[in-house]
Amino acid sequence: MGGHLSPWPTYTSGQTILQNRKPCSDDYRKRVGSCQQHPFRTAKPQYLEELENYLRKELLLLDLGTDSTQELRLQPYREIFEFFIEDFKTYKPLLSSIKNAYEGMLAHQREKIRALEPLKAKLVTVNEDCNERILAMRAEEKYEISLLKKEKMNLLKLIDKKNEEKISLQSEVTKLRKNLAEEYLHYLSERDACKILIADLNELRYQREDMSLAQSPGIWGEDPVKLTLALKMTRQDLTRTQMELNNMKANFGDVVPRRDFEMQEKTNKDLQEQLDTLRASYEEVRKEHEILMQLHMSTLKERDQFFSELQEIQRTSTPRPDWTKCKDVVAGGPERWQMLAEGKNSDQLVDVLLEEIGSGLLREKDFFPGLGYGEAIPAFLRFDGLVENKKPSKKDVVNLLKDAWKERLAEEQKETFPDFFFNFLEHRFGPSDAMAWAYTIFENIKIFHSNEVMSQFYAVLMGKRSENVYVTQKETVAQLLKEMTNADSQNEGLLTMEQFNTVLKSTFPLKTEEQIQELMEAGGWHPSSSNADLLNYRSLFMEDEEGQSEPFVQKLWEQYMDEKDEYLQQLKQELGIELHEEVTLPKLRGGLMTIDPSLDKQTVNTYMSQAFQLPESEMPEEGDEKEEAVVEILQTALERLQVIDIRRVGPREPEPAS
């Protein structure tokens, strides 16, 4: 490609030079006409044709390949651009800077794509969690719908029963009203008969009196005036009595006997009460039915919404990975992968796979690039250049970290943990190999998050956790083993389940019954176990060659972390402020004393010193006015307290009953 260079289009006709002219002007039209009259006749140079043929051939070869990518398709263009740079010496600096700018941009885009890979994995995890939640919600919804259907059927049966009772009561009321009307007519007939009999009786009495007067005139003959007056008065009394009787008939003709009225009134009152009760029951059942129908409709609406969301997620989300594909890739084959994947969810399987990939990459690396001497670089990693990879086994790293912890605990003059770590490596391997071992150990503990010894050492080394947390946890485990040994009177390494339970409750008096039950299950207790069953308690504190503890000790650590989170959450709730708001030293101290009244002054000062990053000697005394000036964001204070060994000292005082 480096043959003779043609000067084209340097000496072509002047018409090839582009001029900035207004497109619609007269001058523009004249120039266009002139250009049409004198067309270009300059031929394409040989160098340009060779470059085009070369580019066409390379692109054709790439198109024939099955695995060509956009990165490979750029390679012919990059080579042609390099030919330009080499052949055109005058423009070489400018063309080189252009090439470097584009290469830098491509490298930046590659790094950006690589940085987005974890986000893709996170999206996969979120999708899996959403699928699980949707399945759980659908199962719960199905169960609730079945319960609502059963309850609806029961309510419908109850409504039918109440309707039947209502109909029967209505028929009974109708029958009673009919009987009442019949009785009324009967008594009305009797009243009329009595009136007729009374009239007949009066008529007979008058006739008898008249006959008596006619048969014995001598008796009354002595005083006829008197008799006439008496008869007149009697007839007046009769007339008055007859008028009163007529008034009484008019006023009380429709009146029934009080006894019958009271009996019918009582019956009517009872029926009315029953009717009111049935109406109230019916109204209550109707309202419950309406509420259930509303719940049913809202449930159907939520179901449709969740179903549409599920379809949208299934359409847009990444499918669930098939983890069985890893068994043929991971070192050790299907048996080792089955052992690694047992009892783990997708998120944990990702960590396992990353550890396997990371360990494989570590074994392939012979050197690590130095991180430099920046202030953000830990002191034990400050080095410029290549650092040898010592390639120790996982077991060797764990044993080395255990030795470091032993020496740290035996150290009298405490220095910072990173400085101690580097001094330990210098003393162990010499100054020449200390940096290589520091990089090697750091890369290993950064990868193996599932290993207890490595993950805890990494957290302490990077300042994410105080070393007192590790020390306190070891002391707790040692104290628990001592208590179990004291309870083992025969020194056989065996305890009954009852003794095991007693030791746990005496060692951890603040743990709930549920937490004690979890520890017993982690130790080997089953619901079918009896109090007399024996337990080999020493096996609970064993460790494998890689430093992994038994499930019992792991459960102790999990409960410790959960208790710490719950303790800090109670503190946040007691303070009653948001995470982004500021909290003063007196308020934080008061919140701690409220949720944990058994705290002593020294412990509280230690917590305050950590939360506000003040030496205990510089902290203001309790009640001092300077306390209000010490403030910190609540979230920052809680994160600092999360680092140290903070736990409940005594039970929280119960709130007074109202």
Swiss-Prot record:
Keyword set includes Protein transport: no
Domain of life: Eukaryota
Transmembrane segments: none
A cellular-component GO term for this protein: perinuclear region of cytoplasm
UniProt main location, coarse: cytoplasm
Annotated coiled-coil segments of the chain: 144-184, 230-295
InterPro entries with a match to the protein in the record: TSNAXIP1_N
Keyword set, alphabetical order: Coiled coil, Cytoplasm, Developmental protein, Differentiation, Spermatogenesis
GO BP field: cell differentiation; spermatogenesis
Record's subcellular location: Cytoplasm, Perinuclear region
Function, in words: Possible role in spermatogenesis.
The protein's assembly and partners: Interacts with TSNAX.
Protein name: Translin-associated factor X-interacting protein 1
Name of the coding gene: TSNAXIP1
